[in-house]
């Protein structure tokens, strides 16, 4: 097993970003047998893995469900994934890089899946895109609060998130009517 230890001189001479990138590259190399040579390659690797895992999770979560029930199940699956795999979910929440067809394809597959869930709820076009952005913000916000324990007076983050998703889903008709008016 390789040692990833750095001497004090190396640590002081190297930016933390570079050290972390080197550590990640070594970890990825150990796990996959491939050695990413650049930070961009690592970002691609992590984003592709995150997109694929997240798509598997949300697909499984809404199996046998449709409409509001499917969307609620998807929201909970995204939150659970974000809590279990914060780095991969962060990579998957990013906008696809324009220089990598695999990244764009993985992003597009997840995006189409999500837009289809909103279509089941009567949202199309810009209304569906706006609702998707709001859902991403809702999930990220609750995930960050849960990780940092920053919501005061909350006994259960799960229960609080359940209520937030209920309110979000109940408000979807507002997006639908706004989409027809624009």
Across the structure, where does each feature detected by a protein language model lie?
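Amphipathic alpha-helical packing segments from all-alpha helical-bundle domains
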Residues: 97-122, 129-134, 162-170
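Amphipathic alpha-helical segments used for helix-helix packing
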Residues: 79-100, 144-151
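Amphipathic alpha-helical core segments of compact helical bundles
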Residues: 29, 136-140, 144
